[in-house]
Design a protein with these regions (language model features):
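Alpha-carbonic anhydrase
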Residues: 1-238
Length: 238
């Protein structure tokens, strides 16, 4: 005898069995210290294009070969930058002087795929995940970055340009960040697969409001915070 389940019932069942979901609210006092580094090898030129429907658009990074691609080193692995997407309010929540009840003005997710290449980083930990996602908060600031390059980058989402360069200002700000929180979770959009290692930086990027406003057509709907359950959330700073 076979049984059938409607999509609604399947979704309800998965809501019960899921235990390692994202995003989460980060409580700094409940995190544990771990000596861990993330090393950037991002190039100054990162090109790609926007694709997807409104409400679920990604900046897809063009594959330009192993020498010109952008990578990070985390754990005992090398990860290649593949996609970037944006949320006009942050998905992760973190109590901070620059947040409002834990929420920031925006959040950017830099999605990296594992590279099957032996490397030596000094860190023996292998991440049991299909992707490493680096999350950076963003705050509106009157002294934040503002440039024609930043404006044209987000405007390109609507223009349909086939090749767009990621603003150097974003690359410079992100690659200077050091302090982060780390946990294992899920995609924040369907199918919410629990195969993501998350690095969420403590300090936000500073951008001018006029830069953030054009982000709206590219943004993905923010998912509500999920319970920690029995997970550890770690930090790499004292």
């Amino acid at each position: 005898m076979t049984s059938t389940m409607t999509s609604d019932k399947v979704e309800s069942f998965l809501e019960v069995v899921r235990e390692h979901e994202s995003p989460i609210r980060i409580y700094p006092e409940q995190t544990a210290f771990i000596s861990k580094k993330l090393q950037f090898d991002w190039k100054e030129v990162i090109e790609g294009h926007f694709e997807g429907d409104d409400g679920h658009k990604n900046f897809v990074v063009h594959d330009c070969g192993s020498k010109e691609s952008s990578f990070v080193y985390f754990g005992s692995q090398k990860w290649k930058l593949a996609k970037i997407h944006f949320h006009r309010r942050s998905e992760h929540l973190l109590e901070s002087k620059q947040s409002k009840d834990g929420s920031f003005d925006a959040e950017i997710h830099f999605i990296h795929a594992p590279v099957k290449e032996p490397i030596e980083t000094g860190d023996k930990m292998i991440e049991p995940s299909e992707n490493l996602v680096i999350g950076t908060f963003v705050v509106e600031s009157s002294t934040g970055a503002k440039s024609d390059e930043l404006m044209s980058f987000f405007s390109a989402c609507e223009s349909g340009e086939k090749s767009v360069r990621m603003p150097l200002e974003i690359i410079k700000q992100v690659t200077k960040l050091e302090h982060f929180y780390f946990y294992r979770g899920s995609l924040t959009t369907k199918p919410y697969s629990e195969n993501i290692s998350w690095v969420v930086f403590e300090s936000p990027l500073q951008l001018d409001k006029t830069v953030l406003d054009p982000i709206c057509p590219t943004t993905q709907e923010a998912r509500k915070g999920q319970p920690w359950n029995r997970r550890f959330v770690l930090r790499n700073f004292q």
